[in-house]
Structures are given as structure tokens and as C-alpha cells.
Design a protein with these regions (language model features):
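A cross-family detector of function-defining hotspots
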Residues: 16-147
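Short acidic, low-complexity intrinsically disordered linear motifs used
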Residues: 1-10
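Short, aromatic-enriched amphipathic alpha-helices that serve as compact interaction elements
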Residues: 11-15
Length: 147
């Protein structure tokens, strides 16, 4: 019988995109083995302040604020008032609001970018900042300069 690590590595060999595999292996070193997996995604629960972290075997081109690829999703519990739905969507297509679950997610190319995105959403909901694409992009670019 195969151990989980062998099974996981065999699963990675079937993924179409290399970057999500590399990032998933990095997360394994940080968080340990994923809590769930399918043929095309991995999931960790309650890690690093997130409700869940999901890496998918996808590589989505995203042009804002600069061209990059998205494949990692992070979620938190947060009720976003409907009045912010459109302004947040206009700020970034990476902001994912699920009104039924009362959660908000971010899809970016790193956990750090997701944390920056979700902090932006929390600041908008708390009305500490106006929801604008310029403010969102400023935060992402500032985060990138730090790393």
C-alpha cells in the first residue's frame, strides 16, 4: 500500500501546470500535508488565519495590476454588505464573495497577495477605505515591493 506522500507526488505528476505544483510543495513544507485532495486541487483548513487555502491545477492569466497567473484561493468568514459587491468586483476580479456561506475569498498567485486582497475587502467593509481599483492595485504593488 502506498503512503500518502507517494500518492500525493503521483497526483502532482498528472497536473498540467507546474507552478501550482511548486507552490503546493512549498505549502506542504509550511503547513504539512493537505487536508483534502482531488485529481486537480489540494485544500488546507484553518491555516495562517484562513478558513481554507485551495491550490488548483490551473494557471489563470490576470493582468491587474501587472500580468501574472492565479491558481491559489484563500477564504475567510466575512459578511460583505451587498452595497459593496459591485465596487469590489470593479476593484478586482480576484475577489470572490459567497453570500450564502458568509465568506469571501481571493484568487491570486500567492498567499501573501490573497491576504492583501482580503485585508482590502475587510477595510472596505469596515468603511476605512473607499473601494477603488486604484486603492486595490496600490496595495498589491506595495506588497510586491516588500518581497
Amino acid at each position: 500500500m502506498k503512503n500518502f506522500k507517494t500518492f500525493l507526488n503521483e497526483s502532482y505528476s498528472n497536473w498540467e501546470n507546474d507552478e501550482p505544483v511548486s507552490y503546493a510543495k512549498h505549502l506542504e513544507k509550511t503547513f504539512g500535508s493537505p487536508d483534502e485532495m482531488t485529481d486537480s486541487q489540494l485544500c488546507w483548513f484553518n491555516k495562517d488565519g484562513f478558513k481554507r487555502i485551495v491550490i488548483k491545477d490551473e494557471y489563470i492569466l490576470h493582468g491587474s495590476p501587472a500580468p501574472h497567473y492565479d491558481f491559489i484561493y484563500c477564504y475567510i468568514d466575512s459578511r460583505v454588505p451587498e452595497k459593496f459587491a459591485e465596487p469590489l468586483a470593479e476593484s478586482s476580479g480576484s475577489i470572490l464573495i459567497d453570500y450564502l456561506k458568509g465568506e469571501v475569498g481571493a484568487r491570486c498567485g500567492s498567499i501573501t497577495a490573497n491576504a492583501t486582497t482580503l485585508n482590502y475587502v475587510l477595510d472596505v467593509v469596515a468603511e476605512r477605505v473607499s473601494p477603488t481599483k486604484m486603492e486595490y492595485e496600490r496595495r498589491i504593488l506595495e506588497m510586491k515591493r516588500m518581497f
